[in-house]
Amino acid sequence: MTTIPTPILNMPAEEYHEARASYLTSHGLMDYIKCPLTHRLKQSGMMPNKTSKSFAIGTALHTLVLEGTAEFERNYFSPFPGTEPINEKTGKPYGVATKAYTDWLESEALGREVLSPSDYDMVVGMHNAVQHHTEASTLLSDGTPEGVLRTTINGVDVQTRMDWYNPCAGIVDLKTIGDLDDFGEQFDKYNYGIQAAFYQMVAEEVLGKCLPFYATVVEKAPTHRVGVFTVNTHTLERYRRQVERHIERYAQSMAANDWPTGYESIRMIGGE
């Protein structure tokens, strides 16, 4: 693994996310595009960011794939079947809802986040699939994980936390999905193009070069198919123009302290 280049900041995830009140991120911009008021409430801490099991699985996968087994084991614990405490009266393992099991789990986890055996198997299976995919493993064979970039675009302070920066290949983003065949549709539905353009624009400001963007996508269920996707130059340029417009709107919202929902006027459904 290469040394992190000077302009790229090595920063804990907690510190990065705590700075969302001061720096606009790609996810913050996507929230703003959907609803400026929702973005503002999240940014100010008045509305908590929702987390889900899928998010937790994705975070665990990022740790294992991008930071390695040692870091994964420092942060995660899974109670393997057959290691649970036994109830002497019944001769069977304590149920997961019992105090005896909870106390045992806490003593074994030692502050680490707990993954169920099935979730652990899922994360390891996805990791192995990524490692055995030629294109994905090549992109991840050199570079640095979770590097932070900060700069100013159109008067707005922005930051990104790249999943992986490969100095020869570009920016690599790691994603999970239910069905790999749906990624093209999800790319549009979840504004991944905005995310890719935002990352590229910030990197160009900080590093002085236009970097290709790759999405490495892995299915959560066996067979854990893996695909590597990139965005053609014409499409990415279109998304870059959108990002510029949205950041300009964002700057105006900041200046006026105006955060609409986008549904202030009457909307027509169907034809005239």
Give the positions of each predicted feature:
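Non-catalytic protein-protein interaction segments used by genome-maintenance enzymes to assemble
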Residues: 149-193
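Metal-dependent nuclease catalytic regions and adjoining charged, substrate-binding loops involved
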Residues: 6-8, 185-190, 198-272
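Short acidic (Asp/Glu) and glycine-rich catalytic loops that position anionic groups and cofactors
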Residues: 39-43, 176-180, 221-225
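Hydrophobic (often cysteine-bearing) scaffold residues that line and stabilize catalytic clefts
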Residues: 53, 57, 195, 239
